[in-house]
């Protein structure tokens, strides 16, 4: 997930603090397996307009789950790729070729393709806030995925972020889940889509069905591109989902990325962040073989 100014609590501590274990999803790894089988059967092509900092990682994560990325952002070819794609991923991180974002969303609407939007740094700079809200006003979006500060900005129209990181005051903890979930639902209802808020606890909702995900490790905040990669992974799940399944699709994509982080950390903790980054891709490509479980809960 995109870096947040708070470390994740260890999984055991989180489980001990859980207030409502009755809502924990059973057989969640089998559910994840069914999603991956659907992706690997359909091998959806994703048209990705992502940022130049993390483009390679995003492409590799999409490949690791069984989907296929095309990273074409030139305005004159975006319509053709949206037409043949199963879904569209837009990340406004470096705002290069920003005119292509609107073209992609316009043609995605015309062709009926789901869009996953990552509003990187919204609230930190007026230009990207204006751009993102303008896109959302004009075109439908299947999933918005961002950190707590970015999502709050989309709910309130103003926010405070530390560059592209979430502000400390926006951290998602056991105590702040109700307040943060209210923000997630507000954005989902405002823009008529599923919203995935990344944090120490991830929150996902379409305004009606809501999930909490407790997968992941603090090291994920120290490697650039984990949030962008999760957006790409979410795009793969969204591309094979029905409209009514978008919240579930985003929840399992979120869990899968967190699970991969846990598996990668187990191997790389004595080596360092460079090895962790490599092991993260390894774990994503073999996630069902890893000794990790989705920790998803219906709220």
Model-predicted segments: where are they?
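Glycine-rich phosphate/adenosyl-contacting loop at the front of the ribokinase-like
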Residues: 18, 22-71
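Acidic-glycine-rich active-site phosphate/pyrophosphate-binding loop
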Residues: 24-37, 193-215
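Charged C-terminal helix
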Residues: 27-30, 259-299
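Active-site cofactor/substrate anionic-group-binding motifs, chiefly glycine-
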Residues: 61, 65-111, 117
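Glycine/small-residue-rich loop that forms an oxyanion/phosphate-binding "nest" at active or ligand-binding sites
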Residues: 104-146
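Conserved phosphate/ATP/ADP-binding segment of small-molecule kinases
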Residues: 128-210
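Short glycine/threonine-rich catalytic loop with a Thr-x-Gly-x-Asp
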Residues: 217-234, 246-247
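Conserved post-catalytic alpha-helical subdomain immediately downstream of the catalytic base
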Residues: 234-278
